[in-house]
Amino acid sequence: MCGRYVVSRATSELLPDLLAGLPDLPDDFNVAPTTAVPVVRQRHGERELPRARWGLTPSWYPDLKKRPQPINARIETVATNGMFRRPFAQARCIVPALGYYEWVVTETGKQPHFVHQPEAALAMAGVMSAWPDPSKADDDPDKWVLSMSIITRDAHVAPGEVHDRMPACLAPDSYDDWLGDHLGTAELLELLDRDSHELAHDLTHHPVSRDANSVRNTGPQLIEPVTLG
């Protein structure tokens, strides 16, 4: 599972193959579900960086209050699940991140860990949906509310030490293939499975302050390592 992650201006510098020519990313060291976050998508052959609410709202929902609005989609079912099938086929995206948090249950409570790739950042695979706001006119630029889910897979090596699921991340050579429309379902799933499995070996994690437990706390100090007593 991926339920909290980090994005910062440094992410732009660490993902040049993905974010070159796009606006700088904001600093948010405690991104939580329902937040409108930057995502990379491709339209008319060009990459752009819109914001999408974290938690997929299908286009057929009557309003934004209807649940569920899943924050994660499983790689095993994303291409066949009724909620994700169309977004996977038509609206794939990449969610840039400096890293993400996972929690380990200890005798003294839940201990957050920051999972990241040293000297790099993560290009997490996602799917998007556009929900038509019935209160807006068709020509209103705010008519369509974008939302997204992050695709996850079974975790192994370092990420598997803190949770049994992890975000499915893409390698730079696969960005165009993932965002484009020239590959079929089987090829896309194979690409994502291969990349995410290999990239997991580059990830590491360390315990961080329990201040990260509250979404009201933010700032770069949240990802600094702490010594557990």
What annotation goes with each model-predicted range?
Residues 1-229:
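Short linear sequence motif anchored by a di-proline
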